[in-house]
Amino acid sequence: MSDGFTLWFTGLSGAGKTTIAEIVGPELERRGRLVEYLDGDAVRQHLSKGLGFSKEDRDTNIERAGWVASRLTRQGGAVIVSAISPYAETRAKARDMIEEFGPFVEVHIDASVETCAERDVKGLYEKAFRGEIKGFTGVDDPYEEPDSPEVVVETEGKTPEESADVVIARLEELGLIPAQVTA
């Protein structure tokens, strides 16, 4: 088995997944890890073009991200996936694919729908609340919170840097990255 692993950031739109991932990644690189990012929007654009937002299409999108992450993990990469991935069963499938080659670290980025709506610069929540967008996760489509993620980051009242520190500390505890030596 390689020394690769996957961090799977899951949470509502606007919870802070990508923001925190973009802080964690450079820290992993600083500690000698080769990092690859699979952002949900980029995966949808490049690997899942043409898919909609039905449950089946969302599952297909996440399974594709999981397959790519498993291959990168097999090659020793530190893979950071940031995707809403709303359904527990599909996250479990991704976990199974990835754990064949290395650890899967589920990182639940937790924020209320209200907080996410306040952070929403695209106005998607407002449109979903008005019924202009159907099937919006957390509004009229479910988000199944993880039962036992390896990391839970409650972002309300924390800066993105403080949230990233929670993830880094847990990776140190799990032995996936060397502990930071402070003088």
Predicted regions: what they are:
Residues F9:
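Hydrophobic anchor at the beta1->P-loop junction of P-loop NTPases
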